[in-house]
Amino acid sequence: MKQEADKKALCPIFEDDLDSADFSLSKLIRVAEIDKKHAESIVCQDSIGFESKQKDLRIVTIYPDKASAFGLTFYPDSESELYYVDPSDRDHYIALDEYFNYLKVARVSELQKIAQDLGAKHFRVTYKEQKKSFEANAAKAILGAKAQGKQSGNAEYSHDAQSSAFSKIEIAAEMECIGHKPVEPKLVYFKKDPQILNLVALRLSDNPLTHQVYTLALSNSTGIKVKDAIKIDAALASMKCIGNATVTSEAQSESRRFFEYEIDF
């Protein structure tokens, strides 16, 4: 009876469990040495990790010397403690501290590959981050204009504030190409993005496209939404694994980030 109770409390994971249809990895995983209570329990002998629930979040902890048994790849390596799953690959985990920057670079690379596959002669990806105060100020201005019956309030505010709307604007990628007949690109992070899907469909159907500009919200293709980040931060606080910046603040920043995707054929 005690062993059953210990097993239920400690939730050890064994290599055989990985083949079970009932087992799945959590989106957030931890790579850490076995702790004292698991190391000293007979029910955890030969285990490769364990499951736990921190606040409302299920977390799988993997022992470093057993990580290879899970068949995962880690970015940048397996030396970090906390990882979150890549939204495009369930077997690829990204260090939590690197998560948003990694996905930014990966998506810029994908947009470049899409342009090349579609036979673009020129493309540019401009990365923009909206100021935190801009959303609130814009909303107030629009509401104020509506209250006064000014139909053009939105446009006027947008024009006046455009130069100061963003805290960051940078050219993330730009290239001149020879151009060629389109080849259907393999979509990864943008496989559900309606604008990119429309671009591909138009180009493959030989529509006379010449110049297209799209605004792509990064929050649409990220793996951590603000609601997820709140749960992650609560779990990390419970585990006493709080870093310099909260995941919630990063996710909120991500919700203000955009790619302006300009492409010429």
Task: Label each PLM-derived region with a short phrase.
Residues 136-159, 226-251:
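Glycine- and small hydrophobic-rich membrane-insertion segments that are intrinsically disordered
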Residues 1-8, 150-162, 181:
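Polar low-complexity intrinsically disordered regions
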Residues 97-135, 156-227, 246-265:
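Membrane pore-forming effector domains from diverse proteins
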Residues 1-136, 144:
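An N-terminally focused, membrane-permeabilizing/fusogenic/translocator signature enriched
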Residues 49, 64, 71, 119-120, ...:
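Residue-identity detector for glycine
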